Amino acid sequence: RQMCIRDRDYSIRLAGITGQVRPHIEKCRVLVLAADNGVTAEGISSAPTSVTLSQVINMTRHKTGMSALAYYFGNEVVVADMGIDTDRPIPGVLDRKVRRSTGNIAREPAMTRQQALQALETGMGLAAQAAADGVQALGIGEMGIGNTTTSAAVLAALTHAPAQAVTGRGGGLTDAAFEKKKQVIDRALALHRPDPADPVGVLAAVGGLDLAAMTGAFLGCAQNHVPAVVDGYISIVAALTAVRLCPAAGEYLFLSHASYEIGYRIAAQELGQEPCLLLGMRLGEGSGCPVMFQILRAACAIMDGMATFPEAAIEDDYLAPIRAQDSFTVTP
């Protein structure tokens, strides 16, 4: 079949994941894992921690970038509280709280190993529930002020990269705050010395409850044969952590859009994948997922409906010279 090479690759991968020669992606869901991060006490975030709760509430009202897109495209949105810094119940949000916020990684571990495992297993369970609900593609998003800092720390720990190479400005920082952010990450890594061969230990030491649950969600997608859509920086770091735990999970990942965070490229290279879209978004939340769902649907439509040359009554002898070249092939 003649088609966009990437759409062709997507449809082939979807066929392998679903076991269907002509896969269909209809029911899609964005799963948002939300938690606060104690490292914000170091003054490395432009927004106060209260924004986490406010944005989670706005998600349930379709008032954030991600939820507005999801609502427009007819996608489901499920938000789970993994560790928002509040005791109040949040209508429309699943209560899966492991603890209120995490520890300040510059001074103490983010959480205990048992708490990291609890968050990871919760994410796996939420992905399994999505599969049971008939979801055919699950996007993994997040909400948590300070989570670009924890993501950079986790990525640095997993890849031996210096903080300078994986740390961006997140939601926006002054030059002074940006330098402090890198120093805080360096200090956290020096304090905890997380072992890259122990991804759960890395999450417990310098990660976040949102990251741990997202990691579990990616593992749960693989376990239940559900295509998993990766959003931006935080999401791709969680995806890489999942792959470090279970390399086969990488076969279920579909990278949506490229993040402007400097560490995104490192994580993508570690996964051996390229993002599909360059949208210039700095929203997080899972905002790239609803758009990527449409790309996957398009790939399925091409596989299902596009004719081969013989089916279209087109003679393809003229392609012989092109096919003879190693640098360019056209697949009938």
Predicted regions and their residues:
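Short glycine/serine/threonine-rich phosphate/pyrophosphate-binding segments
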Residues: 40-41, 140, 145-152, 211-215, ...
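A glycine- and small-aliphatic-rich helix-loop capping segment at beta-alpha/alpha-beta transitions
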Residues: 47-53, 153-165, 245-251, 298-301
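Phosphate/pyrophosphate-binding betaalpha-module
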Residues: 138, 149-213
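Hydrophobic alpha-helical bundle architecture
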Residues: 216-255, 274-282
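Active-site cofactor/substrate anionic-group-binding motifs, chiefly glycine-
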Residues: 24-90
